[in-house]
A protein has these predicted regions:
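Surface-exposed, charged secondary-structure patches
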Residues: 32, 82-123
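Short, low-complexity N-terminal intrinsically disordered segments enriched in polar/charged residues
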Residues: 4, 20-53
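Short, well-ordered alpha-helical segments enriched in acidic and aromatic residues
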Residues: 54-70
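A short gly/proline-enriched turn/hairpin at secondary-structure junctions
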Residues: 68-77, 93
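N-terminal signal peptide c-region/cleavage motif recognized by signal peptidases
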Residues: 15-18
Length: 148
């Protein structure tokens, strides 16, 4: 009788743990993964991956708390950190059909300003990105977008 109780308890434990793992889904841990942002170049590369390749891992740690994004157009818009992070998380896995080029405009031990150009078939998006060293990691603190 004790063996039967132990068998049912083991089966119940296996069933519960299987359902718990299935509820998380295969990509649940990937979005919470830490990314290496120890250099400005790594942070810039990750920013480009997030904006153009739908990379969602490490999005929360990529942007500074006071991050601000401005979009220059006839109807200028501004977005804060939480709005941008939420938007990028929704775009998980979506790849942009564009050619990407990056140019470092200015760089020091504490900050970097880069120009990221996305050339699409009918228009070009230019993104001026400011990155800052905050502690041991680099974070994106500002982004200004324009379209041609």
């Amino acid at each position: 009788m004790k063996a039967l109780v132990k068998t049912f308890a083991a089966a119940a434990l296996i069933t519960v743990s299987t359902f718990a793992m299935a509820a998380e889904g295969p990509g649940a841990k990937a979005t919470k993964a830490n990314v290496n942002l120890s250099t400005a170049d790594l942070a810039l590369d990750h920013y480009v991956a997030v904006t153009t390749e739908g990379e969602s891992a490490g999005v929360d740690q990529l942007f500074a708390e006071d991050f601000n994004q401005k979009i220059q157009s006839s109807n200028a818009q501004s977005y804060n950190r939480s709005e941008v992070v939420k938007s990028f998380k929704k775009q998980k896995g979506e790849k942009m059909n564009c050619t990407v080029s990056t140019d470092i405009i200015e760089e020091s031990a504490e900050y970097m300003v880069a120009k990221v150009t996305l050339k699409f078939e009918n228009f070009t998006k230019t993104d001026l990105v400011t990155l800052e060293r905050l502690g041991k990691n680099w974070k994106v603190s500002k982004s200004i977008n324009s379209y041609k």
